[in-house]
């Protein structure tokens, strides 16, 4: 297993448009839409206008409801929702694209989102922003951003150990990597869960794996964060097929946030074990 459709998006994109694609992703929360808009527009002004015309807001489950206290209950999907998507590092420019920031930007009105992105990340002057967007209360827009999770750090050994525990389907070991207030969510399922105990009960109840070897985790690079394409063994033919794409937020306390994306368009049709 050596990649996914997620990485194919980077391969199909013009590398000279990396900055514009990253800008459009920060506006839209979708790598697919970002590539489309960047291909059709030569300037940041034109691309920003099209992003505003699309006026999409892509949420995560944490934006729609409170945490669930029933990790063993039935999971409900909302496939009609346009969910936030991860972003391949191969497309990223030098500015921030971490998922917590993108999710926070998606909660803002689109014009305020554009103003914050253009000023803080693209270094546009207030006059240039006003010429494009009209008057915007930039300090007020910036103040509306929710506080982000604890400071992210690079912990490759933790990510590797987490991968090994998942491939062994060792749930107690998996849970040792999560911070006490960790969040687990998995669009398009609307429920989300807080704390290692609930996360463990969720995995034990709903994960199709039965033992070691049922899951294979392929490391990816997404949103400048550790990520894994998870392939699950199909017991009918022993082929590992696309199951979910996990993006992790790591802090000194451990994994503070895990998002498991079940959008299978991010994967090839199947992978042989």
Name each model feature, range by range.
Residues 33-36, 53, 120, 170:
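Acidic active-site catalytic centers that drive phospho-/nucleotidyl reactions
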Residues 17, 39-73:
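Σ70-family region 2.3-2.4 aromatic/basic alpha-helix that recognizes the −10 promoter
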Residues 49, 53, 123, 184:
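Active-site micro-motifs of SAM-dependent methyltransferase domains
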């Amino acid at each position: 297993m050596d990649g996914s459709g997620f990485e194919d998006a980077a391969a199909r994109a013009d590398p000279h448009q990396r900055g514009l694609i990253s800008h459009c992703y920060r506006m839209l929360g979708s790598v697919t839409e970002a590539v489309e808009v960047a291909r059709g527009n030569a300037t940041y002004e034109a691309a920003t206008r099209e992003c505003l015309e699309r006026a999409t807001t892509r949420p995560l489950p944490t934006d729609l409801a409170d945490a669930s206290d029933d990790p063993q209950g039935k999971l409900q999907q909302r496939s009609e929702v346009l969910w936030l998507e991860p972003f391949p590092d191969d497309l990223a420019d030098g500015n921030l694209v971490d998922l917590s920031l993108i999710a926070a930007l998606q909660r803002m009105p689109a014009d305020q989102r554009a103003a914050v992105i253009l000023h803080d990340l693209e270094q546009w002057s207030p006059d240039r922003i006003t010429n494009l967007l009209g008057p915007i209360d930039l300090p007020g827009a910036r103040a509306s951003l929710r506080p982000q999770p604890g400071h992210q750090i690079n912990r490759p050994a933790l990510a590797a150990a987490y991968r090994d525990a998942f491939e062994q389907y060792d749930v107690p070991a998996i849970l040792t990597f999560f911070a006490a207030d960790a969040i687990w969510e998995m669009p398009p399922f609307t429920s989300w869960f807080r704390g290692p105990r609930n996360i463990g009960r969720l995995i034990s109840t709903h994960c199709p794996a039965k033992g070691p070897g049922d899951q294979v985790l392929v490391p990816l690079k997404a949103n400048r964060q550790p990520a894994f394409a998870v392939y699950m063994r199909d017991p009918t033919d022993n082929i590992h097929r696309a199951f979910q794409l996990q993006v992790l937020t790591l802090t000194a306390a451990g994994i503070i946030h895990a998002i498991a994306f079940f959008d299978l368009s991010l994967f090839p049709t199947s992978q042989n074990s």
